[in-house]
Swiss-Prot record:
Subunit record text: Monomer.
Cofactor info, note text: Binds 1 Mg(2+) ion per monomer.
Cofactor or coenzyme needed: Mg(2+)
Cell compartments where the protein resides: Cytoplasm; Nucleus
Protein name: UMP-CMP kinase 1
Region annotation LID: where it falls in the sequence: 128-136
Gene Ontology annotations of biological process type: 'de novo' pyrimidine nucleobase biosynthetic process; CDP biosynthetic process; UDP biosynthetic process
Length: 191
């Protein structure tokens, strides 16, 4: 059974940065739903490429079956990992329902790491991070933030109600954020 930590927060909250540090220091494999989707979009002969491209450009959510299949394949490919950080997923109730349908009984969801950060700070980070993403422009970012507020934040509230959320303020310097994240993982691994 795979240990899974969901890493959620608004676009630009530092999910990728913190996941890289957790991977390097704690041995969890970082699976970014967005990176997997972008890679699939670019893969020659992908049956989902055009569909994924349309959703990414519009800032909308890709069908859950596609995302779950990509995540499951990535976990199978790294089956000897300590655990998995799933960054940017689930993004809504449909994602969570689809995840449970496809992955129920195959994984141990340890907790949800919620990186909270003011939206204006997140947008500024995205515009200046220089990753060359097609969706790092003001128009797409506004749509992504709107999608986050309408769809993802309610799923975070759901996880909060069932006691799974561990919130860390990610507006601070990365070293401070990471120190708090390490404490969250240490507490979770003592249980």
């Amino acid at each position: 059974m795979y240990n899974v930590v969901f890493v959620l927060g608004p676009p630009g909250s530092g999910k990728g940065t913190i996941c890289t540090q957790i991977h390097e220091n704690l041995g969890y494999v970082h699976l970014s739903a967005g990176d997997l989707l972008r890679a699939e979009r670019e893969r020659a002969g992908s049956e989902y490429g055009a569909l994924i491209e349309g959703h990414i450009k519009n800032g909308s959510i890709v069908p859950v079956e596609i995302t779950c299949a990509l995540l499951e394949n990535a976990m199978i490919a790294s089956k000897d990992a300590n655990g998995f950080l799933i960054d940017g997923f689930p993004r809504n109730e449909d994602n969570w329902s689809g995840w449970n349908k496809q992955m129920g009984g195959k994984v141990n969801e340890q907790f949800v790491l919620f990186l909270s950060c003011p939206v204006d700070v997140c947008i500024d980070r995205c515009l200046h991070r220089g990753q060359g993403r097609t969706d790092d422009n003001v128009e797409s970012l506004k749509k992504r933030v709107e999608t986050y507020n309408q769809s993802t934040f309610p799923i975070i509230e759901h996880f909060e109600k069932v006691g799974m959320v561990r919130e860390v303020n990610s507006e601070r310097p990365v070293t401070e954020v990471y120190e708090d994240v390490v404490k969250v993982f240490a507490a979770a691994n003592q249980k």
